[in-house]
Every structure is written in structure tokens, then in C-alpha cells.
């Protein structure tokens, strides 16, 4: 009888600790010390939320930097999500997979020697918000032409917004870069 009572007490204590106190403590720590990150790292422009620093978006206009291709086609449509059951993730296809090869060829829209790897392939999450500085610099002439500004101004903007990679190439956040472009005075 004593063993049963001890087992029930331990179960209740574990449920309270793991199911209530620990989540409450982590939520409080997140809200107090990491408020921006705990709430999605949302970016506001013109008094409205335009996206998250953590999730890439599908950019198609020539006047904006384009992010990495998405393995899940930036699946933010609830109908698609219900049908496909995927909201993020890589393709998990091998280098020899014909569908992957076709998708990469589709994303390579200009001379093959001029394409960075991140311009043609998706990230592991399928929603990476960053591109390499090299990729951004290769897009600079297109953006400069579309906005009727000098390529050097666009390149300066890229250099000003770049973030240092630890074990990776330097990179830029596409959404932040595009907002900076919109804020740029002609």
C-alpha cells in the first residue's frame, strides 16, 4: 500500500513540476529576458507587422532581394498546410534525385557560373530568412536597375547590413535588407 501511495505522489509531483512549473518558468524567463525572440522576432514597418526576422518570405519583384528557394514553397496557406501536412522542412532528396535537379534548374535563372549555392537550393528548414552576402551582391545590379540607383549604393547597403557567420559565410537578412531598400532616399 505504501508503494502505491508513493507512486501516486511521485506521479502528481512530476506532473506539477513538468506540466506546470517548468513551462511557467521557461515562459517567464523568455518573456522577461528574451521578449523579442519569445514573441517571434516580428519586424514592424510603417506601423504594421511585415514579417519575422526568423522566417523567410517569397519575394518576386525585381526591385527587391530574393531569398532562398523554399522546399515547401513558403507553405503559409492553411489549405495547403492541411492538404500537404508540411509547414517547414527540407526536401530530403538526394543530389541525384530528378525532381531536385529540375527544381534547382528552375531556380537558376541566369548564367550557371554566376549563381551562388544558396540562390539555387533550399535550406534545411525550407524557410531560411538569410542569403549570403555574395548572393546579395550578385542581385545588386538587378535591384539598382529596377530602382534607378547606382549599384554601389545597393552594395553599400548590403555591406552595412551584413552579419558575420561563425562557421559560415557572411549573410544578410532578406526582409531587413528589403525594408532598408524601401527606406533608402533616392
From Swiss-Prot:
One of its GO terms (molecular function) is P-type potassium transmembrane transporter activity. It comes from the Bacteria. Belongs to the KdpC family. Part of the high-affinity ATP-driven potassium transport (or Kdp) system, which catalyzes the hydrolysis of ATP coupled with the electrogenic transport of potassium into the cytoplasm. This subunit acts as a catalytic chaperone that increases the ATP-binding affinity of the ATP-hydrolyzing subunit KdpB by the formation of a transient KdpB/KdpC/ATP ternary complex. This is Potassium-transporting ATPase KdpC subunit. The chain crosses the membrane at residues 10-30. It is a single-pass membrane protein. It is found in: Cell membrane. The system is composed of three essential subunits: KdpA, KdpB and KdpC. Coiled coil: none annotated. The keyword Zinc-finger does not apply. The keyword Repressor does not apply. The gene is kdpC. GO terms for cellular component: plasma membrane. Keywords: ATP-binding, Cell membrane, Ion transport, Membrane, Nucleotide-binding, Potassium, Potassium transport, Transmembrane, Transmembrane helix, Transport. It comes from Staphylococcus aureus (strain MRSA252).
